[in-house]
Amino acid sequence: MQMGMAVLVLVIACGVLSVLFAIWAIRSVLAADQGTQRMQEIAEAIREGASAYLTRQYSTIAIVGIVVFLLAWYLLSLNAAMGFLIGAVLSGVTGFIGMHVSVRANVRTAQAASLSLAGGLELAFKSGAITGLLVAGLALLGVSVYYFVLTVWLGYAPADRTVIDSLVSLGFGASLISIFARLGGGIFTKGADVGGDLVGKVEAGIPEDDPRNPATIADNVGDNVGDCAGMAADLFETYAVTVVATMVLGAIFFHGSDALTNVMLYPLMICGACVITSIAGTFFVKLGVNGSIMGALYKGLIATGLLSIVGLGVANTLTVGWGEIGTVAGKSITGTNLFVCGLIGLIVTGLIVVITEYYTGTNKRPVNSIAQASVTGHGTNVIQGLAVSLESTALPAIVIVGGIISTYQLAGLFGTAIAVTAMLGIAGMIVALDAFGPVTDNAGGIAEMAGLDPEVRKATDALDAVGNTTKAVTKGYAIGSAGLGALVLFAAYSNDLAYFAANGQIYPYFADMGPVSFDLSNPYVVAGLIFGGLIPYLFGGMAMTAVGRAGGAVVQEVRRQFREKPGIMTGKERPDYARAVDLLTKAAIREMIIPSLLPVLAPIVVYFGVLLISGSKAAAFAALGASLLGVIINGLFVAISMTSGGGAWDNAKKSFEDGFTDADGVKHMKGSEAHKASVTGDTVGDPYKDTAGPAVNPAIKITNIVALLLLAVLAHMA
């Protein structure tokens, strides 16, 4: 136990180091030059809009959170309610601090880029690293410190139901914040983007980020609340939920074993080691002699991955060792096999990054095919974009299947869980790549609105083009890890259910239930699969509709300002930027509530609906379990299709910024008919990649977390 205590303290120290590094980086970023007075005025407007939106969003979520906290206290225990509170608060804090830095780094990045491309890259990436390492550090601290409190201070055994229920509740707290932040931020950012583009670029013929567009500030605000705060909450949730699910599986599989304590600490130690490797990886991000921005970022990612192999070895040595740990479902589990599972997790991460970059990167076949289709019109652009979005699901799915089968063969479901934990271990570096995107996007907008030298805009555009790809790549990673993480949660659900059923004398609700079969010949299983499968589509449809409504409101507002203030187009009158920001804030908050509650309530409706119809608890649990699989499988494909397809549409549009040469050798410039067709495609792709697709991620996980909590609540019933 003493060794276990030392390992747990070491894990906590790793989390603290991550937060301290983020604090150091914050001071470094805020010390940089803010540029001209005009640049600072624009940045201040973006800051005010982002803070106003996030404050209102969190105030709304807090109302829901208080209700859930009280329910968790009443239905489970105070410890479970406190777990929920810890997960929710830390998730919110991560997003808020990340956005707080992002909206201050944008103007500093624009100023640094005016001096050198390398300076702009360094500042933007350092800003992203703050968010990334806060995500990893606070998620790790949340789980490890609360586990320490429960097992050391309060004296519960590691596999005690109080510990498991409290950790699952922590994951639920993170999930609830995540789905609201992802969806609300996505509706805001894409409502501004779509509305502003349709009137500004297509109707008025003015360029992106032109200060004459009343939606420009709202668009830049949206980049931060969607891609920075939203992604931070998403990956915080995936990180926390995956670690918790792996610990739950360890508690179930190794219950009563001498190895139990070390098995429970193993995923925490993996994450602790990988936090350190992520910090080290940030120092490798330097612009090389070839001037490749993506190459500089990949150096950091590759260094993190290679160092993490050593980190996995350290985690093994300090916890489970290298020999046999125990036998699970007739399969011998060894430390060496678990180490290999961790390696497979890192390989899956690398492959998903490469595949996503191929489908979304400029000068690659998929993006070029959409740009070429734009030459023949708006319709062909949309058709080709949809084709690419559908095609982009195949290779990631094959990689994920390979990861599942290989890890299962090596170490069963616990091996798969360790692979996903290793994937999430390097989340600090991945989120850094993502949060780099909104900073560079904003920097370009500030350079344009402040009227800086065209060479500065050229530098920020180069950073922004890479930022677009990194945002797409990190979404691919987030979806892949979410899909595998949800599979681990499903494994926790099915094994938890089996545990309760086998101990009916302790948990009376399950005493007379009988065996639960997930056999496909069971009609309730098929019904559950179909019901679960519809949730990502319905959820995605609701999200797209919300963006359409918000975008439509922005279109009307921008048209009104152009109509009532004709001096805007000549530069004699100033647009009312705050009006568009306020309009979108209200729309996003209003539109996010119902879609966000869909995946939360769906598992409860499935269970009690089937129980009411069939009168059989076994049938209801089978239908619920099947619905979780339906959500995972369809959610995975819907999310990949939307994010990769949307990213390809976006970069196809950017192909025309410097001129696109078609198959016949004709060059199409910005403002051409082909460019206008690409803008139409991008207005479809934007809500695909930044609202509906990413929001499916937390929807997948929250359905599984709610199902786990439902089991816990029923087990507490006398």
Swiss-Prot record:
It holds the Pfam family H_PPase. The record marks 471 as: Determinant of potassium independence. The record marks 182, 227, 234, 690, 701 as: Important for ion transport. Its cofactor is Mg(2+). It is a multi-pass membrane protein. It is found in: Cell inner membrane. Homodimer. Proton pump that utilizes the energy of pyrophosphate hydrolysis as the driving force for proton movement across the membrane. Generates a proton motive force. This is K(+)-insensitive pyrophosphate-energized proton pump.
